[in-house]
UniProtKB/Swiss-Prot annotation:
Lineage: Bacteria, Pseudomonadati, Spirochaetota, Spirochaetia, Leptospirales
The protein, known as: Histidine--tRNA ligase
Transmembrane regions listed in the UniProt entry: none
InterPro entries: aa-tRNA-synth_II, aa-tRNA-synth_II/BPL/LPL, Anticodon-bd, Anticodon-bd_dom_sf, His-tRNA-ligase, HisRS-like_core, HisRS/HisZ, HisRS_anticodon
Recorded superkingdom: Bacteria
Gene name as annotated: hisS
GO biological process: histidyl-tRNA aminoacylation
SUPFAM superfamilies reported for this sequence: Class II aaRS ABD-related (SSF52954), Class II aaRS and biotin synthetases (SSF55681)
Protein's organism: Leptospira borgpetersenii serovar Hardjo-bovis (strain JB197)
GO cellular component terms, semicolon-separated: cytoplasm
GO molecular function: ATP binding; histidine-tRNA ligase activity
Assembly information from the UniProt record: Homodimer.
Length: 439
């Protein structure tokens, strides 16, 4: 019996993806729209190392990330390092390290890949890419105004129609005042109830009630007040005793100005928005997909006033958000917003005969120098097989250069979709292709 060789699996690591050319075209298109939108607001792109000291995340990231989701190990120099699960700690380190030289306000963005060890599921993988946008050095609500305007502009740039998403807004000080003043909870109780409220949408009402009961002093009265708070709007929330009036005033002013900028139809006040108890200190928001098939949070962010506290005595306020590629792709698919990304705007050039190989390459070189993306075959297989290659790769146009075309200083172009074929002059060919064929 012959020895059987155990081949390695071709599957990617659990929770990660291979990006074949067609998936890469989609990813590049998504990133280009995001990048183009953020750049239009005057933001600058940055990046940092994928490896950081474990201590950075221990000090800056949430408990769940550090204890259960972090990929960390001891390197060959006996240093404990971690693969970045989020970009904010790196951002804080970089800003603090160059704080004196940064003109304010600081407007930065990045699209890094991030790693978290968690159970892969719908909209959640172990490796994903995320647009991170941050604005520092502005203490007024103008920062929230710009960030929310950008969060809205990104989806509009993808063609998202009005009503396909909502921007839910709340304020951390509103929640804090409710828990401490209205419910009169201790700091320990506040921490536990906040964490439970943060995961409320992911558990059943029965589980939520059972888990919150031990955290309350007077269950019936306090639980009823919690239900009232979570169901409140901007008018009714102000009637709850102990609620911070400044937070309500802040959100009202913000909504009024955003309405004047044309995005009031997407805005919703939602006091159930938590966005991580240990992180945000002011206004918080989440963008939700309204499609019944994908009714979930797409991305979100908020205000943080202690960004660089681990590195510097200087205080620097900031606000930002993160938009992951997995949830964005799901949103675009559910709302049919992904265009045809086949290679229609590129040209395929077969080799008609070995004797004119150099002439064919000269033509393709000329086309590329004039800004037309051109793929050239590298051997003179039967023309039918070469066209099959072009069709399989998604090309629409094939350009033929044979001996007769060389003599007459022409080329033949064929539309693989319609089957139409016509002769074009060599002189001014690039301009003709750009104008008439939009290549």
């Amino acid at each position: 019996m012959e020895n059987q060789k155990n081949f390695l699996t071709t599957a990617p690591y659990k929770g990660t993806r291979d990006f074949y050319p067609e998936e890469m075209r989609l990813r590049n298109w998504m990133f280009s729209i995001m990048r183009e939108t953020v750049l239009s607001f005057g933001y600058e792109e940055y990046d940092g190392p994928i490896l950081e000291s474990f201590d950075l995340y221990k000090a800056k990231s949430g408990e769940e990330i550090v204890e259960r989701q972090l990929y960390d190990f001891i390197d060959k120099g006996e240093r404990r390092v971690a693969i970045r699960p989020e970009m904010t700690p790196t951002l804080a380190r970089m800003v603090a390290g160059n704080l004196r030289n940064l003109p304010r306000p600081v407007r930065w963005f990045s699209i890094p890949n991030l790693w978290r060890y968690e159970q892969p599921g719908k909209g959640r993988l172990r490796e994903h890419w995320q647009l991170n946008v941050d604005l520092f050095g502005v203490d007024t609500h103008r920062a929230e105004l710009e960030i929310l305007l950008m969060a809205d502009s990104i989806l509009k740039k993808f063609g998202a129609p009005t009503g396909s998403y909502q921007i839910k807004v709340s304020h951390r000080k509103l929640l804090d005042s409710f828990l401490k003043n209205s419910l009169k909870l201790s700091d320990h109780q506040v921490h536990g109830v906040s964490k439970l409220l943060d995961k409320k949408s992911k558990i059943s009402p029965e589980t939520f009630e059972a888990e919150i009961k031990p955290l309350l002093n007077n269950f019936n009265e306090q639980f009823s007040l919690i239900e009232t708070y979570l169901a409140s709007n901007l008018e009714t929330v102000s009637t709850i005793p102990g609620i911070d009036p400044d937070s309500i005033h802040f959100i009202r002013n913000l909504f009024q100005e955003l309405g004047e900028l044309g995005i009031d139809k997407q805005l919703v006040f939602d006091p159930s928005i938590i966005r991580g108890f240990d992180y945000y200190t002011g206004c918080i928001f989440e963008v939700f997909d309204t499609n019944p098939e994908n009714r979930r949070s797409l991305y979100g962010g908020g205000r943080y006033d202690n960004l660089i506290g681990l590195f510097s005595k200087e205080q620097l306020s900031g606000i930002g958000f993160g938009l992951g590629d997995v949830t964005l792709k799901s949103f675009l698919e559910n709302h049919n917003l992904i265009p045809d990304l086949s290679r229609e705007k590129t040209l395929f050039l077969p080799i008609m005969d070995e004797s004119i190989f150099v002439d064919t390459f000269k033509l393709s070189k000329e086309l590329r120098e004039n800004g037309i993306l051109t793929e050239t075959m590298l051997d003179s297989a039967k023309i039918g097989k070469q066209i099959q290659v072009a069709e399989k790769k998604g090309y629409r146009y094939v350009l033929f250069l044979g001996e007769s075309e060389i003599r007459t200083e022409t080329v033949q172009i064929k539309d693989l979709v319609s089957g139409e074929q016509k002769s074009l002059p060599r002189k001014g060919l690039s301009d003709i292709l750009k104008k008439d064929f939009r290549l």
